[in-house]
């Protein structure tokens, strides 16, 4: 009587392991690239949020200047109220401080996965980037009159 054998042969096992190795070698670079793309997308989203918040704060300041007999936002300093938050202003745009553009854009270092450093310019770096300073958004306050603040996006180190 012959016994039937159950299981895999050594050759079958080697072939399966080789196929899994080849698939892993092709999938790993794509996975790593997805993380980079995700950090770039996050930086672009925060960049857009900061630009929009600065424009909205300026519009709010302009309305305050035009309609109020005692405006809180003046041509050079002051504050404006956005969504119940008092936004610090300089030259009709948010300051680079926490009470300025950080509050206007409603950024939170902990929950947004960013590191917020510097004073003017203010640097918002994406956590987990290869070179955090090169995966960041920089906000420099407006220096005079209706000149917009300098907002730059750097994604070379994401």
Model-derived features with residue positions:
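Membrane-proximal N-terminal amphipathic helix
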Residues: 38-65
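Periplasmic/extracellular, small/polar-rich flexible segments of pilin-like filament-forming proteins
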Residues: 59-158
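Short glycine-rich loop/turn motifs that provide flexible caps or phosphate-binding loops at active sites
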Residues: 6, 17-20, 47, 83, ...
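N-terminal single-pass transmembrane signal-anchor helix
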Residues: 1-35, 42
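Short amphipathic alpha-helical "recognition" segments used for binding
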Residues: 16, 39-41, 96, 110
């Amino acid at each position: 009587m012959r016994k039937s054998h159950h299981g895999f042969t050594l050759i079958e096992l080697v072939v399966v392991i080789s196929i899994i190795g080849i698939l892993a070698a092709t999938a790993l670079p794509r996975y790593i690239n997805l993380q980079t793309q995700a950090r770039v997308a996050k930086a672009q989203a925060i960049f857009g949020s900061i630009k929009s918040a600065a424009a909205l704060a300026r519009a709010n300041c302009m309305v305050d200047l035009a309609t109020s007999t005692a405006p809180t936002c003046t041509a050079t300093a002051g504050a404006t109220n956005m969504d119940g938050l008092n936004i610090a202003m300089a030259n009709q745009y948010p300051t680079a401080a926490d009470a300025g553009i950080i509050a206007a854009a409603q950024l939170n270092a902990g929950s947004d996965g960013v590191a917020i450093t510097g004073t003017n310019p203010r640097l918002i770096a994406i956590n987990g980037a290869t070179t955090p300073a090169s995966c960041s958004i920089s906000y420099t306050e407006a220096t005079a009159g209706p000149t917009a603040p300098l907002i730059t996006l750097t994604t070379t180190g994401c």
